[in-house]
Amino acid sequence: MRSILYILLPSIAAWAQAIPLANLDARKLDATVVTYQGKEATRLTDREGGGGLAPIKGSSFKDGAIEVQLAGKPSEGALAGARGFIGIAFRVQGGGSKYECIYLRPTNGRADDMARRNHSTQYASEPEWPWDRLRKESPGDYESYVDLEAGAWTRYKIVVKGTRAELYVHEAAQPCLIVKDLKLGDATGAVALWVGPGTDAYFANLKITPMP
């Protein structure tokens, strides 16, 4: 029987395949280990309808890279506005009350509507700068288009330095989203798996590489 690997080094934290449930502090989410599309994965489902965080216990992150394979799709019975919201929260503080987040809207990636396609990626900073405030005050600055397929495994990477973050998807050489003014400033906090409302989410092969 294949085991779930857990590796923790001084400079790199990495989980091959599923992330052990013992390493997650799931909040408002149900967590299980499953096989999804041939890959051993951590499945997070939205228990209360509002999404939630699953911080990695003991993680501390300021600058560096976070890489993961993820797949998100609307859960069965989700409201029409569900998009399969899925991503990573970082510099999580206050037990999850404050954090930076970059996430995907997988169903937007191939929508027959350019406005939706251009909202395929999203930066938000809770609680002061949710996505809707950023869209209203700075339309187009904190979201972008990238090709996505709901429910399909997607390679996701964010690189963070100071108040700047870049999102890379599908191992692309260039970022599909650049944020130059992270709202929490040059902060330090935990890393968390992030799941939005009405989402069935899968995560595997998480790697956190701090930057000196």
Predicted regions, residues:
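Extracellular glycan-recognition regions
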Residues: 17-212
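Positively charged n-region of N-terminal signal peptides that target proteins for export
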Residues: 1-4
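Hydrophobic h-region of N-terminal signal peptides that target proteins for export
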Residues: 6-17
